[in-house]
């Protein structure tokens, strides 16, 4: 390939010696001999120079549109150009490239590859893995390197058999196996589209997976029609235990229709519900953009978006910038000629670029070390390289193969952006979690296979016999149930003994409790004259204690007191009606059964059960005593001031307590404000739960409740026999609504209705109409009133659950805690945070105003000029060698203005120029200014666009002229609006003029000439100068012009001008210009006949106004 300098020094030495000998001895044939030596040296001298290394980029560029969108010629040219500018490369050699086409059929592709032998020094490719092995053998025979990103066979990694082959990317099979091993997915299926390249890819992939010991259930080929795809999907469903489906076809994200149709039909067949994982194969071969890169194909296709939730996209990681960003930067720097936008280019562009840079780096290493390079030495010197490719870091391992990082991308079935979930480190073959979990359909990963599939030196046989497995599972189930039943029986016996005897007993007697102060014997202390205070002794390091007034510990009996001391704490006894409780043993057994259900109820807003009192014929529930008494007492105590935050805190405590009880399947059945107690920390707790269950357990009949007691009971329970005692979940919600009414108005249930309780109960039982309390909006926020009405809905199924009530109630306080202590602290903190909130609010307002100002500034001035002005920099004038200007005005504008009101003139110009502004938005032009009826536009500045400026202005002019033909004035619809348009191309200077209301202005003779072209034009015509016509003709886009002749231009003399009358392919209708008079001109104003209709209509309106 390259020869070092050592042969030439010996030959030159020999040549000098022969010359001296011939001079000494006068040999006649020495001259002839020297000539022969020179002729022999010429080719060697030619080889001794730094000949270019020609890289052949081989692929199916002409037979597959998706491969042609990779723009291999542009990618190769960009890589060669950057290599030539890279100062780190040895300058003793250079690179060239040639684009070589693979045949579309694999059977013929090898033959075409052989024909390329003499066309390149080394090859990037092939892209078809079907003949990689044969191509690598030929490369070894030719001593030419094969650098491929697509080859699958792991045998190619054997450098003894294939010394001239190297991978520019990690083996796709290594990447797949690394991911499959991590998730324990062994059983795979491979499906390909019916293109020849993908069929051979699928066969190679399946063979490679099987060589790794993994079971590949099916290898299928599908056409693009629905019937073929459905048949393939049915075969996959019938295959045994397939977990992962590898799709060898073009990705749906870059326009692959086959994969799109395949995933849509899989979604219809419920195969994207998490049973299978779909993995696109082609994205393993390039870096698919995902950061800030939404995919419109997912946005516009809801079915595909939902199906893509089951797809894991594994692609080359791009750390700093995506492929689209790197391509756009190269295009902006002018390194890429005019080509499609980056989102229309295949990311395979970057892989081709990286492969060429890969060869250049290897060549550079070889030449620096040895001064020469062969194909085998290139592969050898590609080991342990590291360089930055097109948009990612490229690294190689000790064998010279690429070890780039990959990333696993995922969606949640609702978004159209991909998110990175795991990094696949191919250097260690490990996965690193990136913080965002994979969203699997159904909420859990696809079922894993046995670990033996990925264990070395182990053989998996595919599982045990199903019948044997069922027998084993059944036997284990019987054994497990037997063990659990025996354990449950033992546990019940032990618990029963412990609950009746010992420290955990729940059946209490007079020996366990001490009753105090007979004045506490009224209802739950609601009307008790308890006098106590909480004295905090935090400073002394002791816990708070209760201090009582003298005489508060007067001895009492169980007959006249409900308060007692149990284990040093105050407790409340809820007494049951007198009755026959039976034998003490039955009481013990029943108490044990009930406590099994109630002992685990531990919640901040549920008053805990401490046990049952049974002695001297009395049975009672023992619970904690709450010093603040019941909610009913607090509401009726005028000394307690309650704001809405205080009320909402109490209600939220009640909601949380009832939510907890309902989660534990406990129906309260007796929920009232007097059954809600408040402790010393103003924490509300629900009590008396389970009372009805205990009545049923003891088979006791309850006294008939009074009408006042029934005001909290739901209507359906009032109407149902025995409903009051049974209760229901929906009935508890209704009772909560009545308590809400009590808290809001601080009054009894239905206190505003002014009716006796009995009549209220009768109306509740017999609707219509539905009878409910009436609460004024001034008592609570509208959201709370609405929630209360939902809770007391007549139909029980329409009432919300406490989970829904809790979620709604949280939003009323905007997520703030409603605990009383927290509320007090928040009030104190609010003063200190007010200033911060005010500053933040003002800062946000300032930022919004700044954005508005910047937006207005960029609408008035070019972006680059606006940025300079914002930075306080001086905007230097800028010269433009060639731009095209557009001028237009309204024919007869003076006459129209004279016949119109000022506001009508403003409306006319606003309507017309709004229409123009909408049109220029679709062209590469810049609106300079409007003065009166004059409209000025330029193209080619401030952003240069080559020679396109004339075409952009011409296209815009045709669009404007077409739109004006149908434009009507609001106040003069009968009068036509005609415009004259003038176009001219030439140099201008642009700059910002003035400090007050600065404007971006254009200067130069081109501006004057363009204005003259407009003023000398005719209505409904586009007057074009020779310079503009010349540019349009060079563009060869089919513009139709007519020669006007020589025209007198003020200050310019006479010049030859033209009319622009259309363009090939332009189908919009153009207005017909007025006829030209005998003098070759038309009027520059409105004709009397044109305004006669308007004058006649105006006179008629005046007559109507003057009529009495």
From Swiss-Prot:
PTM characteristics: There are 9 conserved cysteine residues in sensory guanylate cyclases, 6 in the extracellular domain, which may be involved in intra- or interchain disulfide bonds.
InterPro entries: A/G_cyclase, A/G_cyclase_CS, ANF_lig-bd_rcpt, Cyclic_nucleotide_synthase, Kinase-like_dom_sf, Nucleotide_cyclase, Peripla_BP_I, Prot_kinase_dom
Domain Protein kinase span(s) in chain numbering: 532-812
Record topology, Cytoplasmic segments: 491-1108
Keywords: Cell projection, cGMP biosynthesis, Disulfide bond, GTP-binding, Lyase, Membrane, Nucleotide-binding, Sensory transduction, Signal, Transmembrane, Transmembrane helix, Vision
Function: Responsible for the synthesis of cyclic GMP (cGMP) in rods and cones of photoreceptors. Plays an essential role in phototransduction, by mediating cGMP replenishment. May also participate in the trafficking of membrane-asociated proteins to the photoreceptor outer segment membrane.
Family recorded in the similarity comment: Belongs to the adenylyl cyclase class-4/guanylyl cyclase family.
Protein name, UniProt field: Retinal guanylyl cyclase 2
Species name: Mus musculus
């Amino acid at each position: 390939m390259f020869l070092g300098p050592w042969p030439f020094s010996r030959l030159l030495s020999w040549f000098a010696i022969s010359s001296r000998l011939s001079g000494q001895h006068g040999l006649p044939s020495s001259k002839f001999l020297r000539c022969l030596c020179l002729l022999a040296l010429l080719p060697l001298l030619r080889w001794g120079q730094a000949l270019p290394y020609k890289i052949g980029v081989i692929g199916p560029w002409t037979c597959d549109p998706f491969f042609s969108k990779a723009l291999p010629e542009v990618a190769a040219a960009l890589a060669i150009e950057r290599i030539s500018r890279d100062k780190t490369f040895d300058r003793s050699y250079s690179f060239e490239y040639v684009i070589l086409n693979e045949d579309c059929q694999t059977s013929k592709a090898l033959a075409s590859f052989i024909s390329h032998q003499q066309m390149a020094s080394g090859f990037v490719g092939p892209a078809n893995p079907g003949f990689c092995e044969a191509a690598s053998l030929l490369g070894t025979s030719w001593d030419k390197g094969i650098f491929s990103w697509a080859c699958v066979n792991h045998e190619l990694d054997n450098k003894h058999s294939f010394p001239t082959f190297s991978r520019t990317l990690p083996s796709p099979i290594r990447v797949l196996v690394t991911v499959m091993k991590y998730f324990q997915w062994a059983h795979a299926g491979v499906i390909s589209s019916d293109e020849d390249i993908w069929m051979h890819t699928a066969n190679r992939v399946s063979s490679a997976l099987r060589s790794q010991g993994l079971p590949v259930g099916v290898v299928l080929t599908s056409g693009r029609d629905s019937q073929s795809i459905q048949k393939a999907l049915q075969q996959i469903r019938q295959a045994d235990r397939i977990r992962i489906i590898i799709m060898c076809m073009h990705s749906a994200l870059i326009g692959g229709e086959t994969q799109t149709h395949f995933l849509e039909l899989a979604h219809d067949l419920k195969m994207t519900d998490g049973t299978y994982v779909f993995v696109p194969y082609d994205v393993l071969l390039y870096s698919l953009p995902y950061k800030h890169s939404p995919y419109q194909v997912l946005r516009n296709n809801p079915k595909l978006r939902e199906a893509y939730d089951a797809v894991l996209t594994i692609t080359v990681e791009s750390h700093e910038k995506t492929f689209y960003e790197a391509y756009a930067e190269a295009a902006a720097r002018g390194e890429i000629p005019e080509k499609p936008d980056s989102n229309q280019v295949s990311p395979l562009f970057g892989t081709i670029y990286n492969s060429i840079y890969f060869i250049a780096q290897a060549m550079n290493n070889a030449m620096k070390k040895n001064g020469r390079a062969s194909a085998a030495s290139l592969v050898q010197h590609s080991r342990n390289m590291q360089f930055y490719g097109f948009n990612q870091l490229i690294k190689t391992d000790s064998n010279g193969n690429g070890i780039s990082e990959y990333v696993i991308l995922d969606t949640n079935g609702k978004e159209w952006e991909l998110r990175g979930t795991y990094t696949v480190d191919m250097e260690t073959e490990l996965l690193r979690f990136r913080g965002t979990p994979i969203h699997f359909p159904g909420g859990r990963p696809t079922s894993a296979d046995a670990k033996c599939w990925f264990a070395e030196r182990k053989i998996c046989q595919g599982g045990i016999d199903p019948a044997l497995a069922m027998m084993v599972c059944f036997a284990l189930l019987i054994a497990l149930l037997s063990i659990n039943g025996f354990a449950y029986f033992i546990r019940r016996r032990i618990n029963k003994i412990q609950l009746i005897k010992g420290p955990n007993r729940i059946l209490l007697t007079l020996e366990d409790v001490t009753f105090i102060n007979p004045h506490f014997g009224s209802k739950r202390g609601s009307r008790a004259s308890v006098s106590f205070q909480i004295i905090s002794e935090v400073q002394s390091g002791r816990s708070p204690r209760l201090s009582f007034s003298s005489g508060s510990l007067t001895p009492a009996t169980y007959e006249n007191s409900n308060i007692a001391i149990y284990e040093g704490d105050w407790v409340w006894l809820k007494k049951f009606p007198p009755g026959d409780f039976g034998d003490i043993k039955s009481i013990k057994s029943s108490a044990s059964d009930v406590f099994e259900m109630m002992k685990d109820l531990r919640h901040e807003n549920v008053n805990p059960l401490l046990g049952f009192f049974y002695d001297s014929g009395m049975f009672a529930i023992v619970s904690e005593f709450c010093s603040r008494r019941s909610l009913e007492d607090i509401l009726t105590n005028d000394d307690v001031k309650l704001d809405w935050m205080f009320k909402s805190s109490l209600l939220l405590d009640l909601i949380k307590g009832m939510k907890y009880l309902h989660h534990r399947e406990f129906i309260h059945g007796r929920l009232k404000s007097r059954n809600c107690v408040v402790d010393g920390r103003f924490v509300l707790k629900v009590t008396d739960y389970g009372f009805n269950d205990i009545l049923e357990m003891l088979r006791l009949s309850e006294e008939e409740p009074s009408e006042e007691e029934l005001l909290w009971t739901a209507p359906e329970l009032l109407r149902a026999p025995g409903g009051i005692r049974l209760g229901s979940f929906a009935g508890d919600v209704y009772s909560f609504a009545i308590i809400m009414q009590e808290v809001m108005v601080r009054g009894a249930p239905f206190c505003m209705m002014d009716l006796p309780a009995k009549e209220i109960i009768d109306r509740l039982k017999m609707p219509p109409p539905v009878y409910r309390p009436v609460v004024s909006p001034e008592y609570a926020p509208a959201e709370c009133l609405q929630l209360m009405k939902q809770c007391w809905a007549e139909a029980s199924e329409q009432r919300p659950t406490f989970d829904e009530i809790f979620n709604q109630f949280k939003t009323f306080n905007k997520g703030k805690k409603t605990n009383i202590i927290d509320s007090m602290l928040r009030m104190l903190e609010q003063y200190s945070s007010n200033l911060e909130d005010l500053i933040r609010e003002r800062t946000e307002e300032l930022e919004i105003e700044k954005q508005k100002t910047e937006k207005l500034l960029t609408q008035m001035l070019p972006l680059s000029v606006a940025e300079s002005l914002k930075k306080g920099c001086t905007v230097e004038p800028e010269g433009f060698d060639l731009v095209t200007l557009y001028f237009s005005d309204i024919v007869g504008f003076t006459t129209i203005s004279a016949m119109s009101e000022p506001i009508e003139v403003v409306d006319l110009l606003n309507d017309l120029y709004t229409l123009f502004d909408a049109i220029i938005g679709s062209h590469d032009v810049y609106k300079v200014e409007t003065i009166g009826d004059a409209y000025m536009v330029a193209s080619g500045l401030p952003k240069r666009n080559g020679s396109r400026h004339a075409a952009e202005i011409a296209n815009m002019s045709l669009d404007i002229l077409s739109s004006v033909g149908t434009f009507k004035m609001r106040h003069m619809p009968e009068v036509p609006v005609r415009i004259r348009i003038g176009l001219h191309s030439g140099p201008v200077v642009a700059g910002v003029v003035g400090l007050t209301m600065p404007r971006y202005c254009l200067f130069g003779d081109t501006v004057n000439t363009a204005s003259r072209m407009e003023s000398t034009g005719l209505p409904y015509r586009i007057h074009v100068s020779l310079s503009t016509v010349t540019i349009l003709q060079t563009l060869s886009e089919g513009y139709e012009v007519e020669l006007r002749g020589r025209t007198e231009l003020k200050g310019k003399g006479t010049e030859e001008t033209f009319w622009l009358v259309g363009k090939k392919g332009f189908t919009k209708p153009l207005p017909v210009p007025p006829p030209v008079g005998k003098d070759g001109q038309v009027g520059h104003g409105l004709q009397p006949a044109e305004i006669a209709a308007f004058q006649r209509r105006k006179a008629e309106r005046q007559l109507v106004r003057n009529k009495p």
